[in-house]
């Protein structure tokens, strides 16, 4: 009888150890919808919906490792950017504080929360909104813009920030969710 209990205990322990590796630790594979493009960088990848165009190094801002833009009527209505090493941070919380500091003056920050990103031990999401300035080919002055920043540390402990800005009504919530689900940190 003791041998049976020992075997049962060993089997249960083995199962428990195997299951410990399962679950949502952020290490699962990212989900990329069919037909979407992907911004690939050395620290993080993120996909974008049809209708966006990836910018070359010459077109995007010098601090952006990658960017994709959606235009309507000759104006940018949505931009997705990836920044790497934008700050020295030892945690996702520190990276989020630095990312928040980079949001446009006068923006309404609605807070930050934990978010699961494939490959990340921890990550933060910051939601905010602001009125467009009308500059740099963006939405007309005063247009409400919704923004989200996803931030954390990649596998080499380099801070990353993925920023999605979209004029209100130009990026469906379902597509924003798919963008977030597509993120893969490496």
Question: How would you name each of these model-derived features?
Answer:
Residues 23-26:
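Bacterial signal peptide processing site
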Residues 42-97:
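Secretory pathway targeting signatures of secreted, lumenal, and periplasmic proteins
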Residues 52, 158-186:
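Surface-exposed amphipathic alpha-helical segments
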Residues 95-96, 100, 146, 173-180:
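Extracytoplasmic/secreted envelope proteins and their assembly/folding machinery
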Residues 97-151:
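Signature of long, low-cysteine stretches enriched in small and polar/charged residues
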């Amino acid at each position: 009888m003791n041998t049976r209990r020992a075997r049962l205990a060993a089997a249960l322990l083995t199962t428990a150890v195997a299951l410990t590796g399962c679950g949502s630790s952020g290490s699962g594979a990212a989900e990329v919808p069919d037909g979407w493009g992907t911004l690939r960088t050395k620290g993080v990848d993120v996909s974008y919906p049809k209708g966006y165009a990836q910018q070359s190094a010459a077109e995007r801002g010098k601090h952006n490792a990658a960017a994709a833009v959606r235009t309507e009527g000759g104006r940018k209505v949505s931009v997705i950017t990836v920044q790497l090493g934008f700050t020295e941070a030892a945690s996702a919380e520190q990276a989020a504080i630095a990312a928040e500091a980079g949001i446009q003056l006068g923006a309404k920050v609605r807070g930050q929360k934990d978010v699961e990103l494939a490959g990340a031990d921890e990550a933060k999401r910051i939601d905010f909104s602001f009125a467009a300035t009308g500059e740099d080919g963006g939405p007309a002055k005063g247009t409400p813009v919704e923004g989200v920043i996803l931030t954390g540390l990649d596998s080499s402990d380099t801070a990353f920030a993925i920023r999605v800005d979209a004029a209100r009504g130009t990026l469906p919530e379902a597509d924003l969710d798919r963008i977030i689900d597509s993120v893969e940190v490496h």
